[in-house]
Amino acid sequence: DENLIAVQIDAAINFGNSGGPVISGGKVVGVAMQSGFFTENIGYMIPTPIIQHFLKDVEDGKSEGFGFPGFLVQSMENPAMRRKYSVEDDQTGVLAHKIYPNSPADGIMKVGDIITKIDGHAIQNNGTVEFRPGEYLNYTHWIDLHQLGDEIKFSIIRDDQPMEVALKMNRPGKEFLLVQPNQ
């Protein structure tokens, strides 16, 4: 299962009414969906970047989903953690605390790397990236914008040295689950 961006809207979408277009200013901006079985008068939509990703993905007749870079992170908001990893007060980023074997990150990133940017966007200590002035999304949204086969550039700090690395999204995230869906 993917954890993708959704937008809360001020239109009620009750059970069974998902799937229609969401229109704003005369343009389709997403697809209406219901996210909770027991919610009423709360609507959500799947925004166009996720829909565009899906449409590009299925051009070859199959849906592969979203890539997974192969690492897990921990926030760097705790001052003691920042001291332990020698992160300066003016530096932001997240700590790579797990690297999956045979993943895009395997052999490129290491546990203890501080990931400071994704595709040139600064990652905050809580794992968010500013996408509009004063508005933040989880850094994984920038991963989700990429198709399988794309390369994602990360800025990291390893052993107090800044580095640039690139990870090729070569496997869907579902391949890294311990139990595969629908089994």
Protein language model annotation of sequence segments:
Residues P104-D106, K117-K153:
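PDZ domains, with a preference for the canonical peptide-binding region formed by the helix
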Residues R83, N126-G127, G134, H141, ...:
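C-terminal, low-ordered peptide segments at domain boundaries
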Residues Q8, A12, D57, G61-Q124:
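PDZ/PDZ-like groove recognition
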Residues I9, S18-V22, G26-V31, I46-P47, ...:
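Terminal peptide-recognition signature
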Residues D1-E2, M33-Y44, L55-E64, L178-Q183:
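Flexible, gly/ser-rich surface segments that form the specificity/activation loops bordering the active-site cleft
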Residues D1-E40, D89-H97:
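Active-site region of chymotrypsin-like
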Residues I5, Y44, M163-L167:
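Short beta-strand segments
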Residues G30-F37, T48, D119-G120, R171:
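Short beta->alpha transition motifs characteristic of CBS
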